[in-house]
């Protein structure tokens, strides 16, 4: 639905469906959807149409975002947002900010989530969030064990 706002409808296609990608602490099912951007749409238009990513918010996205606002006690901050750049040639290289540690005033914050669907098991979803946050938590643990040079 997001790409149909900024792409030629007949060009929008699933080019990869539920491929398994393995990472150090988790596995992901990955699907790719591509389309030819409309001539009157810029890179920023594509960004605005596709973020926040439905994979993190749920669907239908407008209602899912309302529910998130109603239920979650605090803002997600950068989690689920975007890290990257836009250049003057109209290119962009962006990544969704997940499984990251955000540090402010010496305090690190790690957020992780799981996809809740009809047959979700709460214990399994909780275990998934622990697995997803493990790398960032380990990095914080290592950083806290380091001593400044000369100490």
Regions from the language model: what does each represent?
Residues 1-6, 20-23:
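Short acidic, Gly/Ser-rich segments with clustered Asp/Glu that frequently serve as metal-coordination loops
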Residues 9, 22-151:
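Conserved hydrophobic core element of enzyme catalytic domains
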